[in-house]
């Protein structure tokens, strides 16, 4: 005998409510699962981005650009690396192929311009005692208050400290032929001499010295003085090489910048090429 189940209106309402709750609950759970998946994917993507960025920041030790036997240990950006390659290219062309010699030159340039060819701009934030140490008798007649006023006007400052030195004759030569390039070429005489050596009109266009290729040509010509690259002494280590080229860059004699150039040698090493 079949049993007939009779449902009241209240029973039907409860049943329908249960079905709706079940449906909504499943949707909510599905949404939760989707959100969780999206969050995982976002987290994974962010982690990849972070790893990629960190790798890019610290990629110098693994850098395998055209630097010959010189291994870059410093944290250089792409512009600096390109300029280091330029320097090594022109050193090789001039016959400077010994890696210790190359590191000596690069260490001086690291100190002078950090591989970004530039013009001397201002000593406004340099202490008077430091300025007196750098320029000596050229500023000895100025009191501290006069020095404070002088260094606030860069053009006047360079016309004073570079007046009638290294071929400058006054009339704005100090400002016009202030330090530029990778190794901070200074003075009209040097602009003329090294411009002639590399076939560039640096006297007529001194800002040309800040072009990376020209800056590399100037630096190599300055350090070799037109001699073959193999004419340098055999250096025992990086420190000896950096000290030697710091002295050349200062015009001879023990350079006051020796310590800075020597400190920069740690940015470079010699590749173990077998």
Where are these regions (language model features)?
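Binding-interface segments
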Residues: 131-182, 189-192
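Short loop/turn segments at secondary-structure transitions that flank enzyme active sites
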Residues: 114-115, 123, 188-191
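Short, solvent-exposed loop/turn and secondary-structure capping segments
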Residues: 117-127, 196
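Export/targeting segments at the very N-terminus of extracytoplasmic proteins
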Residues: 61-115, 132-151
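N-terminal export signals and maturation junctions of secreted/periplasmic proteins
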Residues: 19, 23-32, 37, 44-93
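Non-catalytic cell-wall polysaccharide-engagement segments
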Residues: 49-52, 57-64, 75-81, 165-274
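Protein-protein interaction and targeting regions used for scaffolding, dimerization, and localization
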Residues: 1-27
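Short, functionally critical alpha-helical segments immediately adjacent to catalytic or ligand/cofactor-binding
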Residues: 100-115, 147-168, 185, 219, ...
């Amino acid at each position: 005998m079949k049993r007939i189940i009779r449902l009241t209106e209240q029973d039907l309402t409860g049943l329908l409510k249960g079905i709706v709750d079940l449906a909504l609950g499943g949707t909510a759970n599905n949404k939760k699962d989707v959100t969780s998946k999206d969050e995982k994917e976002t987290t994974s993507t962010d982690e990849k981005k972070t790893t990629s960025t960190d790798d890019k920041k610290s990629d110098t030790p693994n850098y395998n650009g055209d630097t010959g036997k010189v291994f870059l240990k410093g944290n250089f950006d792409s512009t600096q690396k390109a300029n280091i390659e330029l320097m090594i290219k022109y050193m090789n062309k001039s016959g400077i192929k010994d890696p210790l010699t190359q590191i000596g030159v690069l260490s001086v340039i690291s100190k002078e311009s950090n591989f970004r060819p530039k013009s001397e701009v201002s000593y406004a934030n340099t202490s008077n005692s430091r300025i007196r140490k750098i320029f000596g008798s050229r500023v000895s007649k100025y009191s501290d208050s006069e020095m404070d006023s002088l260094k606030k006007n860069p053009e006047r400052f360079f016309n004073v400290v570079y007046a009638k030195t290294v071929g400058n004759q006054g009339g704005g030569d100090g400002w016009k032929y202030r330090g530029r390039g990778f190794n901070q070429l200074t003075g009209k005489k040097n602009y003329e001499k090294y411009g002639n050596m590399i076939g560039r009109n640096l006297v007529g266009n001194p800002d040309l010295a800040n072009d990376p290729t020209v800056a590399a040509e100037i630096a190599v010509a300055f350090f070799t003085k037109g001699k073959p690259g193999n004419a340098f002494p055999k250096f025992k280590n990086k420190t000896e090489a950096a000290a030697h080229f710091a002295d050349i860059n200062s015009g001879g004699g023990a350079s006051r910048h020796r310590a800075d150039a020597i400190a920069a040698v740690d940015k470079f090493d010699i590749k173990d090429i077998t």
